[in-house]
Amino acid sequence: MVFLLCFFLVADVSYGINKDCLLPKVVGFCRARFPRYYYNSSSRRCEKFIYGGCGGNANNFSSYYECHIKCFGPRAIIFPEDSPKEN
């Protein structure tokens, strides 16, 4: 039981996460349609969204890779099944 508790405390990805990654997704108020990624703190994943081009916040990344590196650090990258791998 103690082992499981320690495992979950260490495995919590929000521990030490970049504060920008905890900001909410903001689509922006302009009408452009830029595909972007943000860190979803509920699902604990980088997810795709459509950015309007202005407004927004720092939780807005041009690629899945950029989001993952910024929010998880230089760990192994796991690409979602529905996204192509980015170079």
From Swiss-Prot:
Signal peptide per UniProt: 1-16
Disulfide bonds listed in the record: C21-C71, C30-C54, C46-C67
Annotated positions for site Reactive bond: R31, A32
Subcellular location as annotated: Secreted; Nematocyst
Keyword Signal listed: yes
Residue stretches making up the BPTI/Kunitz inhibitor domain: 21-71
Propeptide: 76-87
InterPro entries, per database record: Kunitz_BPTI, Kunitz_BPTI_sf, Prtase_inh_Kunz-CS, TFPI/VKTCI-like
Gene Ontology annotations for the cellular component aspect, listed alphabetically: extracellular space; nematocyst
UniProt GO MF annotations: potassium channel regulator activity; serine-type endopeptidase inhibitor activity; toxin activity
Swiss-Prot/TrEMBL keywords: Disulfide bond, Ion channel impairing toxin, Nematocyst, Potassium channel impairing toxin, Protease inhibitor, Secreted, Serine protease inhibitor, Signal, Toxin, Voltage-gated potassium channel impairing toxin
Family listed: Belongs to the venom Kunitz-type family. Sea anemone type 2 potassium channel toxin subfamily.
Database matches in PANTHER family: KUNITZ-TYPE PROTEASE INHIBITOR-RELATED, SERINE PEPTIDASE INHIBITOR, KUNITZ TYPE, 3
Extra facts: Negative results: does nos affect the inward-rectifier potassium channel (KCNJ2/IRK1), as well as Kv1.1/KCNA1, Kv1.2/KCNA2, Kv1.3/KCNA3, and Kv1.4/KCNA4.
Protein's UniProt name: U-actitoxin-Avd3n
Taxonomic lineage: Eukaryota, Metazoa, Cnidaria, Anthozoa, Hexacorallia
